[in-house]
């Protein structure tokens, strides 16, 4: 699909300041900035091409600019990270620990499948949600990622694979809807600057009150994935502490509103935990919540981690859960995580370097 413009996510009318990282800026912003520096407007498009398509990491390396001007802006950061560590799984999945300018480490994952290359990106350093089954939340929360730090993850994976990224999922470290401004800016840049179609971008959230409704107002064509993980409020509170302040019925009401406004189907993520939320009666209860609006359920068999005692259900238990949903006419599939040897699968995005 072509890169449909995110018309509701327009670039800032204010030009980039000279000392701000340039990655994430639109061609309009870059043009304004180069003109501030006394350069002709066409240099903005050239700069845009070098940043997003030629992988330049320093303005001093842009050969089409004069040596004098390159020297004058040598200290202006583009905003690229460095690869701190790289792990490769037998299925070709690659996990990256990326070091940011302040020394913090975030994780990104490159997932090759056939002719596609999907990147799983982080939106925060750590995560404040502290979901009971998730490795990332066990490490605490540091800060939000800036827009350039989000876009950089995609460019880094693309350059390392030497293959064009086709899809991006915001399912790494952090809760995207607690960093809405930078996430929306990152979505805009990935769509309009990097050239990835909106429908190839997936935004995942555990559910933050009112944020899904606010997202709907942008009328985006991105895919929204909601981490549900339980069929009722009591069990969801056990697994997701933040659910105590956001009832499952309120969350689902926002989801229905989102579908009505955008016309886009919602994906519901459901991690299967042995003996916890994987019984046939859980599947039946879940199905009752999902009738009457467009949705799809991704069942994710759990990936065990050292810090918690949850286990993956047996194949028979997974199939039984799947069958109940299918019998209730719920669109459903099982998603088996990639990159287990690299600790890169869903729920295992954790920085070993911080241990």
Curated annotation (Swiss-Prot):
Annotated Radical SAM core domain residues: 113-341
SUPFAM superfamilies: Radical SAM enzymes
HAMAP family on file: RNA_methyltr_RlmN (MF_01849)
Family under the similarity heading: Belongs to the radical SAM superfamily. RlmN family.
Catalytic activity as recorded in UniProt: adenosine(2503) in 23S rRNA + 2 reduced [2Fe-2S]-[ferredoxin] + 2 S-adenosyl-L-methionine = 2-methyladenosine(2503) in 23S rRNA + 5'-deoxyadenosine + L-methionine + 2 oxidized [2Fe-2S]-[ferredoxin] + S-adenosyl-L-homocysteine; adenosine(37) in tRNA + 2 reduced [2Fe-2S]-[ferredoxin] + 2 S-adenosyl-L-methionine = 2-methyladenosine(37) in tRNA + 5'-deoxyadenosine + L-methionine + 2 oxidized [2Fe-2S]-[ferredoxin] + S-adenosyl-L-homocysteine
Protein's UniProt name: Probable dual-specificity RNA methyltransferase RlmN
Function: Specifically methylates position 2 of adenine 2503 in 23S rRNA and position 2 of adenine 37 in tRNAs.
GO biological process per UniProt: rRNA base methylation; tRNA methylation
Cofactor note: Binds 1 [4Fe-4S] cluster. The cluster is coordinated with 3 cysteines and an exchangeable S-adenosyl-L-methionine.
PANTHER family, per database record: 23S RRNA METHYLTRANSFERASE, RADICAL SAM CORE DOMAIN-CONTAINING PROTEIN
Cofactor names: [4Fe-4S] cluster
Anything else known: Reaction proceeds by a ping-pong mechanism involving intermediate methylation of a conserved cysteine residue.
Residues that hold [4Fe-4S] cluster according to the record: 127, 131, 134
Keyword line: 4Fe-4S, Cytoplasm, Disulfide bond, Iron, Iron-sulfur, Metal-binding, Methyltransferase, rRNA processing, S-adenosyl-L-methionine, Transferase, tRNA processing
EC assignment: 2.1.1.192
Entry superkingdom: Bacteria
S-S pairs: 120-346
GO molecular function, one term: tRNA binding
Active site: 107, 346
Gene: rlmN
PROSITE patterns: RADICAL_SAM (PS51918)
Pfam families: Radical_SAM (PF04055), RlmN_N (PF21016)
Organism annotation: Nostoc sp. (strain PCC 7120 / SAG 25.82 / UTEX 2576)
Residues noted as binding S-adenosyl-L-methionine in the record, renumbered to the chain: 174-175, 204, 227-229, 303
Subcellular location: Cytoplasm
Entry's Gene Ontology cellular component terms: cytoplasm
Enzyme class, spelled out: transferase
């Amino acid at each position: 699909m072509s890169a449909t413009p995110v018309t509701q996510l327009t670039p800032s009318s204010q030009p980039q300041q000279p000392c701000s990282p340039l990655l994430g800026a639109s061609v309009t912003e870059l043009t304004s900035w180069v003109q501030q520096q006394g350069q002709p407007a066409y240099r903005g498009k050239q700069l845009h091409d070098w940043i997003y398509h030629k992988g330049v990491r320093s303005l001093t390396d842009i050969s089409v600019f004069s040596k004098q001007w390159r020297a004058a802006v040598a200290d202006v950061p583009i905003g690229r990270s460095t690869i701190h560590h790289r792990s490769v799984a037998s299925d070709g999945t690659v996990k990256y620990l990326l070091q940011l300018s302040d020394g913090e480490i975030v994780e990104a994952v490159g997932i090759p499948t056939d002719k596609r290359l999907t990147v799983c990106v982080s939106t925060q350093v750590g995560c404040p949600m502290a979901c009971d089954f998730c490795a990332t939340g066990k490490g605490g929360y540091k800060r939000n990622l800036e827009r350039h730090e989000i876009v950089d993850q995609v460019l880094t994976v693309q350059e390392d694979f030497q293959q064009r990224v086709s899809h991006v999922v915001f399912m790494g470290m952090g809760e995207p809807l607690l960093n809405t401004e930078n996430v929306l800016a990152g979505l805009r840049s990935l769509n309009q600057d990097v050239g990835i179609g909106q429908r190839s971008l997936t935004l995942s959230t555990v559910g933050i009150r009112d944020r899904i409704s606010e997202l709907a107002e942008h009328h985006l064509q991105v895919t929204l994935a909601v981490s549900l993980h339980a069929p009722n409020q009591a069990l969801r509170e056990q697994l997701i502490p933040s659910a105590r302040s956001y009832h499952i019925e309120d969350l689902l009401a926002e989801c229905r509103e989102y579908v009505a406004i955008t016309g886009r189907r919602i994906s519901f993520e459901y991690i299967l935990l042995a003996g916890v939320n994987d019984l046939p009666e859980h599947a039946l209860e879940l199905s009752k919540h999902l009738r009457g609006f467009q949705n799809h359920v991704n069942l994710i068999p759990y990936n065990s981690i050292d810090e918690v005692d949850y286990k993956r259900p047996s194949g028979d238990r997974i199939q039984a859960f799947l069958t109940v949903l299918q019998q209730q006419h719920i669109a459903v599939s099982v998603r088996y995580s990639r990159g287990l040897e690299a600790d890169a699968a869903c729920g295992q995005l954790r920085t070993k370097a911080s241990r």
